[in-house]
């Protein structure tokens, strides 16, 4: 019968629905089980009646999961009441116990484990019988026996799991005290509830690095100033008003604005350097008056450096024509350097 019970357990395990069983590390669980309890090698005093070795077994257990492979369980088992009848003796035997085992598991899939439990059971066995002549007999015994179990465990949800298990307990009782020393096999179906299995905190992607922006604006000096002057014209103020609205839209979180003034090559280097500085400062002063913080903006005169006309005006000799040809060199460049946060949309 023992071999038959083991074979049935293995066969049923083969049909277990594939699904993650081990609880999270360092968490507790509790459960209950119900199944077929079968006594073996009962060894009663010779009797000519039946011994009902197959009974209903049940139990409750609690455990602590150390990691996906190792846990510890403590539980109570009711192994069933076994009646026996005959001309020589009529009575019943029952056994129950508290067990402590180490549970060793291995994940087959995310939701399915196979496992074994190894440990011991502190049991109590009771017998009560009527013997020929009308006398009665009643006694009990206690002891410790090894426990071996194997099974599969399937996680229905992160909190709830079910298990199919076959458990073997050896030598429950003392034949000299209660008349028998049987072994017990318990094939059971159990369900457990795991604590602390809530969803893991979502992984938050690191914030994207701030985006460094640099914007360049170029304004013609002939629009901003009269020739050879550094005072803004009304048309120049209007142009700077439009520029200021663009700077406001850029809205750097932190950064700076640099105003670069350029002249053409007419006149001495020193004069052109001074004129470019005064023009750049005029633009800075106006933008500060519009609202740009004074500590975020600066002026720099570049004189006649970096001409954009190149040598296109080299053959122009008439002064008026040369002034007109060199107009692109007379300019104000505004460079805005800032850091603008990158806004990311949350994922649905």
Curated annotation (Swiss-Prot):
Signal peptide region: 1-21
Residue spans of the Sequence repeats: 205-206, 207-208, 209-210
Matching CDD domains: OmpA_C-like
Keyword Ion transport attributed: yes
Pfam families, per database record: OmpA, OmpA_membrane
Annotated region described as 3 X 2 AA tandem repeats of A-P, given as residue ranges: 205-210
Transmembrane regions: 27-37, 55-66, 70-78, 96-107, 112-120, 146-155, 160-167, 186-194
GO molecular function, one term: porin activity
Keywords: Cell outer membrane, Conjugation, Disulfide bond, Host-virus interaction, Ion transport, Membrane, Porin, Repeat, Signal, Transmembrane, Transmembrane beta strand, Transport
Disrupted-gene phenotype: No effect on propagation of phage Sf6. Upon infection with phage Sf6, single deletion mutant has a wild-type level of small plaques but a better than wild-type survival level; double ompA-ompC deletions have about 10-fold fewer plaques and survive infection considerably better than wild-type, are infected more slowly and have fewer extracellular vesicles associated with mature bacteriophage.
Disulfide bonds: 313-325
Site location (Part of salt bridge gating mechanism): 73, 163
Keyword Repeat listed: yes
Domain OmpA-like, first and last residues per copy: 212-340
Gene Ontology annotations for the cellular component aspect, listed alphabetically: cell outer membrane; pore complex
Localization per record: Extracellular vesicle; Cell outer membrane
Topology of the protein relative to the lipid bilayer: Multi-pass membrane protein
Region described as Hinge-like: 201-210
Similarity field: Belongs to the outer membrane OOP (TC 1.B.6) superfamily. OmpA family.
Subunit structure: Monomer and homodimer.
Free-text note regarding domains: The extracellular loops are most variable in sequence, and in some bacteria confer sensitivity to phage and/or colicins.
Protein name, UniProt field: Outer membrane protein A
Source organism: Shigella flexneri
Lineage: Bacteria, Pseudomonadati, Pseudomonadota, Gammaproteobacteria, Enterobacterales
Name of the encoding gene: ompA
